[in-house]
Amino acid sequence: MASFPDFVNENEIARSRTIGELITPTSPFEQKYGRENWTVAFAPDGSYFAWSQGHRIVKLVPWSRCLKNFTACSTKNGVNLTNGRLSRQNSDLGQRNKPIEHTIDCGDIVWSLAFGSSVPEKQSRCVNIEWHRFKFGQDQLLLATGLSNGRIKIWDVYTGKLLLNLMDHTEVVRDLTFAPDGSLILVSASRDKTLRVWDLKDDGNMMKVLRGHQNWVYCCAFSPDSSMLCSVGAGKAVFLWDMDKYTMIRKLDGHYNDVVACEFSPDGALLATASYDTRVYVWDPHIGSILFEFGHLFPPPTPIFAGGDNGRWVKSVSFSHDGVHIASLADDNLVRFWRIDKSYPVEVAPLSKGLCCAFSTDGSVLAAGTQDGNAYFWSTPKYVSSLQHLCRMAIRRVMNTNEVKKLPIPQKIMEFLTYQTM
């Protein structure tokens, strides 16, 4: 069994450049259980990076400062990694909300975390007779942490203070995701087989319970327009939900083992799912078809072997902001960078005991967490998107597949816009 197809020479695949690492301090008496870094996340504005260090601790670090430290170390070795885009993002933050480092004790093992950001709201001329304990401003940045005891804690990122304690799940909160429209709607996925929808602008009111999973729910992700939610879990489950009606749209069939991670492309036209069956599938979520398959074991395993302990479980997947690159992390101690127009990785990086990965806000860096509670960072593949692809993304942000198919356009353009051709 091999990690790459026969037509690919592993030695010719480029190695991603490591730019830094954040190591969790340990003591000789510390137990290994509970040290896992189950999740890493970047703030939507690029101001913060957060990771679970294990043993109840979440670390919040200003990303620009962290990147400068990496750059300083790399410059000493003759490599310049200055990132102007992140620097500009952080310079826009007001002095009042200048990022500072926080260490948060969540009170229990942290399995998931997510950043949530509010947006400016239109001022209503009507008299508001509602009362809320918390009134979030237009520059609010929150961190949600999902715990082993089923609780969700909401923190103010700028102060590190606890704001809300959400209690309704009965098992581990395995994943969290905020609606990207600034509504501060939070969805949680749990081992209790449910997804729960919370309204943080209504003091964390639990709005809805989404039922349908027969086993653990591992991960959930909003589409960029917040209209659709994907949830994945044990038993090969991939579900799509309408977040206006809170109903299931469809189930996606194709995986042969537990599905543990999912993420939409920036234009919402594609959905990537990672499974223990050694595969990452890229779907068209609007019609439920598989467009691309990225294998991590060759020759491809049979359904019976893929459904068991095959040694190539894919643990995490992340979509870059360019809509072209995908990162995956598997049990063979490799991080892979894929391009959706190629069936093999364009770059790889060694990583032992990896559990999770996420692209930075601008896609220039990939972060990954490990069983030891550490976080590692790589420079991502350099690629200039074609004008055609940028136009496609602009169109797909406002039109789903069914709407595109109704356009009076040539077949070749239709296939390009629906990602059937690259």
UniProtKB/Swiss-Prot annotation:
UniProt pathway: Protein modification; protein ubiquitination
Keyword Repeat: yes
Keyword Coiled coil among record annotations: no
WD repeat residues: 124-165, 168-208, 212-251, 254-293, 309-346
Pfam families reported for this sequence: SOCS_box, WD40
GO biological process: intracellular signal transduction; protein ubiquitination
Assigned keywords, A-Z: Repeat, Ubl conjugation pathway, WD repeat
Domain SOCS box: 374-422
Oligomeric and partner information: Component of a probable ECS E3 ubiquitin-protein ligase complex that contains the Elongin BC complex.
Record remark: domains: The SOCS box domain mediates the interaction with the Elongin BC complex, an adapter module in different E3 ubiquitin ligase complexes.
General function of this protein: Probable substrate-recognition component of a SCF-like ECS (Elongin-Cullin-SOCS-box protein) E3 ubiquitin-protein ligase complex which mediates the ubiquitination and subsequent proteasomal degradation of target proteins.
Name of the protein in its database record: WD repeat and SOCS box-containing protein 1
Gene: wsb1
